[in-house]
Amino acid sequence: IENIWYIFFCLADSTFSSVYVSYGKKGPYMLSGETMMSICKTLETIDFCCYRDAYSDAYNLLRKCRDDLMQYLFVLNVIQNKHGLTDEEAEKFTINSESMMKMIELDVSILVSGERKTDAELAMEKWIYNVLERSENKEDIKKFFDTSKYKSYLVSNNEKVKYIFDNFLVDKWLREDRKLNNYVHANGIRFVMDNYIYQNKKEDKDKELIETLQ
């Protein structure tokens, strides 16, 4: 777990130095390394659960790690594909400071208005602005904010992600998704009893959890 923690710690450092910015009706917003730092803390808690033989809790937190990472990838892809000024519109501006400022102002005004934004962009902004939880936004949650929805969006809108899923992750995703759901919903008494296993099974449970985490 420590080695995996270091990977996410490095990712957090990288994402804090690679900030993605966009604009909405409530002003500018950005995506940085917040999710990666949160995942690092969750991994520390998973490590503690394993130390205390609380594997049912560890798998529940492992599900949280998976969901948080998928949500981050969803939000990142939406921001990277924001619908502001088109390439054709940008080409009409000349390369001088005054023209560049006008181009930036037009791009920001289009983003703030939201007139070209997709439903995914508008829903993502509600998440950024911390208003997604409100009852009037329940359809956005239903349509976009679920791990299966994140996966569907990413596979449909990012060719690299689609290639990775189709060629390397299909079987593992189905297998591990089923396992994590079983622990979260306690689909059998053994998923509850894994919170107090016998010591002679600890090594096997550690190995199994690491394989799922990887």
Regions found by a protein language model. Give the residues of each.
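N-terminal, Lys/Arg-enriched amphipathic/low-complexity engagement segments
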Residues: 1-35
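A short secondary-structure junction motif
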Residues: 15, 72, 183, 187-191
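Short non-catalytic regulatory patches outside canonical folded cores
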Residues: 20-30, 47, 51-52, 60-178, ...
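Active-site-adjacent bridging/hinge elements
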Residues: 35-43, 197-199
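C-terminal/domain-terminus segments
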Residues: 159, 163, 188-211
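Amphipathic, Lys/Arg-enriched alpha-helical patches that create a basic surface
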Residues: 170-179, 201-214
